[in-house]
Structure formats: C-alpha cells, structure tokens
Amino acid sequence: MSQQVDKIKASYPLFLDQDYKDMLAKKRDGFEEKYPQDKIDEVFQWTTTKEYQELNFQREALTVNPAKACQPLGAVLCALGFEKTMPYVHGSQGCVAYFRSYFNRHFREPVSCVSDSMTEDAAVFGGQQNMKDGLQNCKATYKPDMIAVSTTCMAEVIGDDLNAFINNSKKEGFIPDEFPVPFAHTPSFVGSHVTGWDNMFEGIARYFTLKSMDDKVVGSNKKINIVPGFETYLGNFRVIKRMLSEMGVGYSLLSDPEEVLDTPADGQFRMYAGGTTQEEMKDAPNALNTVLLQPWHLEKTKKFVEGTWKHEVPKLNIPMGLDWTDEFLMKVSEISGQPIPASLTKERGRLVDMMTDSHTWLHGKRFALWGDPDFVMGLVKFLLELGCEPVHILCHNGNKRWKKAVDAILAASPYGKNATVYIGKDLWHLRSLVFTDKPDFMIGNSYGKFIQRDTLHKGKEFEVPLIRIGFPIFDRHHLHRSTTLGYEGAMQILTTLVNSILERLDEETRGMQATDYNHDLVR
C-alpha cells in the first residue's frame, strides 16, 4: 500500500492514492453487488422531490436518523451532576458503552458509568442477582458516596422492580442499609434522553426529601433552587452561576456536572469532581423557590417540587435571547428581593448593541432548526428577536402542547408567518424539507452534516450549510464549553450566526473577476 513510514498521510489524502482507489473498486465490483450508478443517481434525485417528501411524511413505523436519544442517557447526565455519584445502569454493558462514548465524543472527557452486565439469563430470569453483585462491586471498586440507578429496555421489558432489588441488596448485606441508592425507571421505548433526565432527578429528589419534610420550612435557607435539566453546554452552568452571584443571590444548582465534565490535564485523574452535595439536596425544600431552566421537559420534577416541597414554581421559559433572559432575571429579583445590578444591565445593553450592529445581515435569513423542546423554543424566540425567519422547526421529542406554544410565539412575530413546526419527525423528514423548500442555513447538531453533504451533492446552488448549535457536537472541538443562556449566550449565538452568514457570503463572492465585485473587506 502507499502509506510510507517517513511520510504518513491522513486518511482523506491516503485513500485518494491509486492503490486504495484500485482496492476499493475491486471490493465494490467483487463483493458489494452495487447497483448501476445511473440508477443510484436517479433514486437520489427522486428523494429530493416533493413527490418523495409526501411519501416520506407518510411513514408510521420507521424512524430514519432520529433527532433524539434514549432515556438512560439523560439519567446518566443527571447523576453525573451530584458529588461523588456513580451512574449505574441496570442493563447490558453495550448500552453503557454507548452512553459513555456518546458523552466522551461530545465533552472530550472520560465519563464514568457502570452497568450490572445483564445477559440472556438475566433477561429470562430477572436481574436481581446482577443488581446485588453490581452494587457491591461498584461501591467497593469506585468508592462513590452515592449510586444512582437507571434502567435499559431489557430490564423494563421483563419488569424488574428497582425498589425491591435495591432493598433486597441492602437486607442481604451487599451494601450498607444507610448507603444512598436513588433510582429511576427509564424505559428507552418511551420518551427520550430529556425524559430520562427528568425521571432521574425526580428519583434523587424523592430519595432525599420525601420522608423528611416535617421539619422543612419554605424560604428558611434564603436560597433559590436552580434545576438545569438536560444541559450539555458547560458555559451555561457558569453563566447562570455568574449572573446569580452578581445579583448577590444565594442559590443551589441541583445537578451540576460542570467540573466533572471539564477536568484539567494536570497529571491527576478525577473520577469525581464538583457536583451538588447530598446536603444541598436535603436542604432544597427550605429554599425560597425552585426555578426550572427547561420547564418543558421537567414535568415530573415540577410535579414533585410543587406537590412535596410546596414551592410555587414560576412560569418561565428557558433564559435564551433578550426577552426571556429579562424575564428570568426579573423573576429571580422578585423572589430573592435582590436588585438586578448595573453589571447585568450593561451586559444587556451590549447585547442590544450587537443586535443593532448585525441586524442588516441577519434580517430575513431563513433557517431550519432542530433539537430538544426547550432549546428549540428558546432558539426560535431569539431568531425572531433578530429578525430571522425560522421556516422548518423540527422537534422529534416535542409534544402537541409544546407545538401549540411554539406556534403562538411564531404568530406573535411577523418573521414567524412562514414557519411550520414538526413534532415526532426525524432528520430524514428534515432532509426532504430542505430540498423542497430551501432555507439559507440549518441550525442543529453534528448529524446535520450529512444533510448538508446531500444538498451539496445535488448542486452548489442547493447546498444548505450547517451551523452547529445543539447536542451532540462530535465533529468540532470545544463548542461544549460555549454558552447559549443569558445575555452572554445570546451574544455567542448571534456572533456564530452572523459570522456564518458572512463566511458563506465570502465563499460565494471570491471568484476572481466573476463574483469578487462583492468580496468586500468591510462587512
């Protein structure tokens, strides 16, 4: 082969060498039984048509490229946000390998999580013995202060009872009776990763507070509880902390994985780092109130907080963009009695200045976007504030109430009149939409790059560039440290959007003596 020790080539140029071209051609001709290229081209072109879109949208029992993940993924992220807590998945090793690699690739960090290795025998006879041995081994080997248990499809299909299994493990001495093992049933065949986060948080809150409410007094600790929900931008944890600190507000961030998912390379491995303490969780009912940063996917959490903690959860939206950050800060000020400081007022003014500076480039630009319910709703709201036009809005794990709420936001703005909201649809549906009604850009996670590739394959004039905002981001580095919440997050989103537009304009206008009449130095 053409790889030389003294001149190592990366995979992309290497596979362009003639040796590899010949090898791949022989593989195709000898083993792949490939269809004729003209037939492949014909089918590709057909999949870009309105006729195919109509057939595509009639799918009922098939998902192609889902824009969501399964419940235990969210449960693992929630558990990682608590101090010295080991996420424990009652299921097979393969599932946990998937969760860990998913987070590894997004955060570029080692992610600790264990399973109790259920196999065929456990699927038939139940996984109680796996649970007993697994809890014992986990505690002895990794020495956590808490083990947070969730489930996979296998355990849910056969009906394993986590409460009974954990109690039996304690009764038989596999783990001490006082050792905290909160749990949540997280069946992958309903809901999504955001549902799993909600279920796990409710399970942890229930474990630490349900039976100890007698001495709790709402407001006695003078703090505000902040529940982030399924959040994968580490900068968002930091910006919320910063804004509350600048206001002088006492707070408890309930599930805070910021440190464990961003540990330094200083020669010391940290299996555990930072996180919400058990004492903070036990004290949470004494707070002035509880604010949910992503209320659309925290339904069980809200029900528990209102029903058990007796907190009147304020009706807020995710603090993205200008208006909803205003509402968040004003509500925090109202609850805490602390004024909004001049530093945040100045920060708001800078955002408004940036919006004014860039509005001529953003105005009227058409976007397709997808992601989780709260994120998509917040992004739609901010796009409208910028004068952009969201046209294809897809949320695979959204529900009818969410769609109705987004439709109302769109109806309140002149820039939302051409938008359509899709729930329960996947990225193959979105692919059809961007072919038949082309937007200027897509906003979403890394999986959108294949849609961009397909649109480019049809022709340069059909290409829809991807702007990477969302989860997961596998093919770019360090974006997970960015911010999307607060005024700071709005500034970062605005900067990303307008510079993507200008980069695209430069790309289209750098043709020498052809299009470079608009290849301007100043934009």
From Swiss-Prot:
Q: In its keyword annotation, does this UniProt entry include Cell inner membrane?
A: no
Query: What are its cofactors?
Result: [8Fe-7S] cluster
GO biological process: one example: nitrogen fixation
TM region positions:
none
Give the matching InterPro entries: ChlB/BchB/BchZ, Nase/OxRdtase_comp1, Nase_comp1_CS, Nase_Mo-Fe_CF_bsu, Nase_Mo-Fe_CF_bsu_N
One GO molecular function term of this record is:
ATP binding
Q: One GO CC term of this entry?
A: molybdenum-iron nitrogenase complex
Activity control, as annotated, is: Nitrogenase holoenzyme is subject to 'conformational protection' by FeSII; under oxidizing conditions FeSII binds to the holoenzyme and reversibly protects it from oxidation.
For this UniProt record, the keywords arranged alphabetically read as follows: ATP-binding, Iron, Iron-sulfur, Metal-binding, Nitrogen fixation, Nucleotide-binding, Oxidoreductase
Q: How and how many cofactors are bound, per the record note?
A: Binds 1 [8Fe-7S] cluster per heterodimer.
Documented EC number(s): 1.18.6.1
Induction summary: Constitutively expressed during log and stationary phase in sucrose-limited cultures, its levels decrease during stationary phase (at protein level).
State where [8Fe-7S] cluster binds: 70, 95, 153, 188
Q: What class of enzyme is it?
A: oxidoreductase
Give the matching Pfam families.
DUF3364 (PF11844), Oxidored_nitro (PF00148)
Name the catalysed reactions: N2 + 8 reduced [2Fe-2S]-[ferredoxin] + 16 ATP + 16 H2O = H2 + 8 oxidized [2Fe-2S]-[ferredoxin] + 2 NH4(+) + 16 ADP + 16 phosphate + 6 H(+)
Q: What does this protein do?
A: This molybdenum-iron protein is part of the nitrogenase complex that catalyzes the key enzymatic reactions in nitrogen fixation.
Cited NCBIfam families: nifK
Family that this chain belongs to: Belongs to the NifD/NifK/NifE/NifN family.
Q: Which PANTHER family match?
A: LIGHT-INDEPENDENT PROTOCHLOROPHYLLIDE REDUCTASE SUBUNIT B
State the oligomer form and interacting partners: Tetramer of two alpha and two beta chains. Forms complex with the iron protein (nitrogenase component 2).
Name of the protein in its database record: Nitrogenase molybdenum-iron protein beta chain
Q: Which gene encodes it?
A: nifK
